[in-house]
Regions:
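Aromatic/glycine/proline-enriched transmembrane-helix motif characteristic
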Residues: 14, 20-25, 127, 248-322
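Specific aromatic-rich, kink-prone transmembrane helix
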Residues: 119-123, 161-178, 337-338
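Transmembrane helical bundles and short interhelical boundary loops of multi-pass, membrane-embedded
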Residues: 1-11, 20, 41, 49, ...
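Transmembrane signal-anchor helices characteristic of membrane glycosylation enzymes that use polyprenol
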Residues: 3-59, 144-146, 150, 221-235, ...
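Extracytoplasmic catalytic/substrate-binding loops of multi-pass membrane glycan-assembly enzymes
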Residues: 50-64, 79-91, 252-262
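Loop-to-helix entry region of an early transmembrane alpha helix in multi-pass inner-membrane enzymes
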Residues: 3-4, 86, 90, 100-119, ...
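Perimembrane helix-loop-helix junctions
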Residues: 197-221, 232, 333
């Protein structure tokens, strides 16, 4: 009975919160009605998935919540547990106090951030492209995007959480709220290491004079604020700071873990020097980031919001495409940003389609334990999308105009 009441309240809250978000967007009545229908469809898609348990839930999330339940809830934060950073563990500790099956609590959290992701994606699209259809298009597509739907409602993962915060950070930067932007970015990073794929974009925002260097100092401050409760509860600082290093050091026996990275092009069973290839991949990702930063530096006086968004998409696709040891969900930012980017022009639609198909291949492999298609196909799709976005940025920069080059302020 308690579970049924909780689910009814969850669905009602999802619809009410979504309606409030749409009201805040100030859409035309017809567009508002269409988005409301999408909201209902998004909930209908997710509802049957909420009872599904994946191996990640059974092997990690459920035991972690049970550990908190048996060891004093928040007091157990001080104990070494799992490979997630402490901000997400706060939620799991809170769930341990509630008389509801933790599976539904975990997925309820993901549903809330699915909605926030659609909201922030809509805001970003409206900020970059303007017009009356950018917001509803991004909002609707993101709510119904297969990898977004599956990530939270079926898989029970929280990638929409850090992605929503990252998009919020980018939107605030473009909206001339630099301090708030960096704070959101620091919070996003505290939840998920994969935020690092987009962090170089804030260097572009700095030399494009969208923020000042002193604003970047808020990044470690906001990160520290998220871990402060754990420190006060007695968790050693070293344990907290080592979480991401441990994540980066795991699974070195495989160059890709169902991710459509370039390493998926290596035939199964082929004898290769994995250490050498990993170093080459890391070097290539580093060169991509440095090359992009230098390229945009020469155009810094004429960079528009669209240029910055396009650069963000290049990072979201290119960095995990080149890095070794990537997992199936590590292209989540690419999934989301490609949709927002494509809202600006219908001819860009093939890019998010390619990204989504490639990313979905990794989901299919994990969730159904079989491949929908060879992961090498996904790698080719991601590579094609990356090349097209880079070419698009180059053509856009060549057509742009600007005045002089002025160094950014400190």
């Amino acid at each position: 009975m308690a579970l049924n009441i909780f689910l009814v309240l969850l669905f009602a809250a999802f619809l009410c919160l979504g309606t409030l978000v749409l009201v805040k967007a100030k859409l035309e009545p017809a567009v508002f009605g269409l988005c409301l229908a999408v909201l209902v469809a998004a909930l209908a898609l997710r509802a049957p998935m909420l009872s599904h348990q994946t191996y990640d839930y059974q092997d990690f999330l459920a035991p972690w919540v049970q550990f908190f339940r048996e060891n004093g809830g928040f007091l157990a934060i001080r104990q070494p547990l799992g490979d997630y950073n402490v901000p997400y563990l706060y939620f799991l500790a809170a769930f341990s106090y509630l008389p509801i099956a933790d599976l539904y609590l975990i997925k309820a959290l993901s549903l809330v951030f699915d909605l926030l992701l659609a909201f922030t994606g809509g805001r970003l699209a409206r900020r970059v492209f303007g017009g009356k259809y950018a917001y509803p298009a991004a909002f609707s597509i993101l709510l119904l995007l297969p990898t977004v739907v599956l990530n939270g409602a079926y898989w029970g993962q929280c990638d929409s959480l850090y992605a929503a915060l990252t998009l919020l950070a980018l939107t605030d930067a473009l909206d001339d709220h630099p301090a708030r932007s960096v704070v959101w970015l620091g919070i996003a990073f505290s939840f998920k290491l994969q935020t690092i794929f987009l962090i170089p974009l804030w260097c572009v925002l700095w030399y494009a004079k969208r923020l000042k260097f002193r604003h970047l100092c808020l990044f470690p401050v906001s990160y520290f604020a998220t871990i402060l409760p754990a420190l006060l509860l007695g968790k050693p600082l070293g344990d907290i700071l080592s979480v991401y290093f441990k994540q980066a050091g795991q699974y070195h026996d495989r160059l890709t873990l169902n991710a459509p990275s370039l390493f998926a092009l290596i035939p199964s069973g082929a004898e290769v020097d994995a250490d050498l290839l990993a170093k080459l991949g890391i070097g290539a990702a580093f060169l991509l980031v440095i090359g992009l930063l230098l390229w945009l530096f020469f155009y810094r006086s004429r960079l528009t919001d669209q240029h910055i968004l396009t650069a963000g998409l290049i990072l979201a696709i290119g960095v995990p495409l080149l890095l070794p040891y990537m997992h199936d969900r590590y292209f989540f930012l690419a999934d989301v940003l490609s949709v927002v980017w494509a809202v600006g022009a219908y001819r860009r639609a093939p890019i998010p389609v390619c990204v989504q198909i490639a990313s979905f291949g990794g989901y299919h492999a994990y969730l159904l334990l079989r491949y929908a298609f060879p992961m090498a196909w996904g790698a080719w799709l991601m590579l094609a999308a990356l090349v097209c976005v880079i070419v698009s940025l180059g053509l856009s920069l060549r057509k742009g105009t600007g005045q002089g080059n002025i160094l950014p302020e400190l």
